[in-house]
Amino acid sequence: LDKQPTSRGCFLCGRQNDIGLKMNWLNDYEARQVWSEVIIPEGFNGYPGVVHGGIVAALLDETAGRALMLDGDHDGLFITTKLEVKYHLPTPTGEPLRVVGWVIKRGSRFARVGAEIRLPDGRVTAICEAAVARPPRKFFETCDWDSEKQYWKIVE
């Protein structure tokens, strides 16, 4: 299994984000999926012991989008244009979670991707489907991607 790149400031993967989760994603080429394991601490909860729904959505969104990097295209970035999340069970804080993402359909400019969060026993707490698109050049100017790109790398 190969690791995917991480960044410096991203809430989920940023290595220099003091309040971030510092997640890593792995490519499972045989299953055509990407996955990450994470324990979400209290402080990212909505109700006590339950991960906030917005954090759940962020986990799903990032993991679904990362499925597009399975073929090694780490520079062909996409942005989410629509995200539909179905919450099946409370996602617990303080317990190991596995977030899995996959590609549903991919084109050159648009794609549909999905992801789910699994408990150690395999039950799914939440699932998403997202529409993503290649961002226009203006997006990269707004986020100053050219100067940030140097921090987008695989960390061992």
What are these regions (language model features)?
Residues 1-43, 148, 152-156:
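Non-catalytic linker/capping segments at the edges of enzyme domains
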Residues 1-3, 92-93, 104-156:
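HotDog/MaoC-like acyl-thioester-processing domains
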Residues 26-28, 102-106:
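Short beta-strand micro-motifs enriched in acidic
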Residues 31-35, 82, 96-98, 112, ...:
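Intrinsic-disorder/low-complexity, polar/charged segments enriched in Ser/Thr/Lys/Arg/Asp/Glu/Gln
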Residues 35-59:
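A conserved, well-ordered hydrophobic junction motif at loop->secondary-structure transitions
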Residues 37-39, 84-86, 100-102, 116, ...:
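Residue-level recognition of well-ordered beta-strand positions that form the cores
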Residues 46-49, 78, 137-139:
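A short, polar/proline- and glycine-enriched secondary-structure boundary/capping micro-motif
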Residues 63-98, 103:
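Hydrophobic beta-strand-centered segment that forms part of the acyl-chain substrate-binding groove
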